[in-house]
């Protein structure tokens, strides 16, 4: 059954943007879609984007988080609270984790910027953050491990990174998003005034541009919603064999193979030859070998080259077994 056309924008307007703040406008939307889209994006942005954070520390002479460090004003608990606030940006793509040993001496303060001096794959975004204060003669030796993650992970789940009895796991705040606000306003389209405009404000820690953060959140939503878009999904099925129907690649291929050839940019001659042979979809076409196609009436090498180029552009090939995609299950 055909779906009635929705009033929707053809692009997202970026009203303001810098490294940490972005303001976006999305309009026009059907009534009710402003809060639907805005709330979903806000939740994903705050909870589900990847980032980098400290997962474990080891301080020389300290056995647990309730200890104190000689010559250091703050106890270990407060040091951990401050370390949780250090923000990192990946500067070398190959680095998804890094462990460094840091020595602080002849200094009255240990700042986040001191960590950055020892890092290879990451940049510290808030170098002026004070971790702790030291006596003039005190020396502090600390090992820090940085890992990639999503959202918020409590210390208990970071125990897997503890390789030594004196290593202390800490809570990790991976999310690069500091704040997300959205507002829904009325918007007029011709004579109708009940359409909506969604205004979205995103503040990051600087490790990701607000525009990229919005794109990543949208991708996560699309990935989850596409699982409901395939006609052949049986939502009540719990058997193992049914799991493949939820595989992203399988879903993509099933949708692609159902594409009508008349919707592709093919010559009239090639389309007529295929239609005469009851070949109507990409799924029908890829099951044939090239030699089989040349047996079709009025089908020549020029048409074969045209189809070969089409399939190659779609990462498809002739002689494909499509049985695993279960296109016959309507």
From Swiss-Prot:
Keywords, sorted A to Z: DNA-directed RNA polymerase, Nucleotidyltransferase, Transcription, Transferase
Class of this enzyme: transferase
InterPro entries per UniProt: DNA-dir_RNA_pol_insert, DNA-dir_RNA_pol_RpoA/D/Rpb3, DNA-dir_RpoA, RBP11-like, RNAP_asu_C, RNApol_insert_sf
Transmembrane segments annotated in the record for this chain: none
A UniProt-annotated Pfam family: RNA_pol_A_CTD
Stored CDD domains: RNAP_alpha_NTD
An example Gene Ontology CC term for this record: cytoplasm
Ranges for region Alpha N-terminal domain (alpha-NTD): 1-232
Enzyme Commission code(s) on record: 2.7.7.6
GO terms (BP aspect): DNA-templated transcription
Subunit structure as annotated in this protein's UniProt entry: Homodimer. The RNAP catalytic core consists of 2 alpha, 1 beta, 1 beta' and 1 omega subunit. When a sigma factor is associated with the core the holoenzyme is formed, which can initiate transcription.
Family: Belongs to the RNA polymerase alpha chain family.
Domain notes: The N-terminal domain is essential for RNAP assembly and basal transcription, whereas the C-terminal domain is involved in interaction with transcriptional regulators and with upstream promoter elements.
Record's function text: DNA-dependent RNA polymerase catalyzes the transcription of DNA into RNA using the four ribonucleoside triphosphates as substrates.
Protein name as catalogued: DNA-directed RNA polymerase subunit alpha
This protein's encoding gene: rpoA
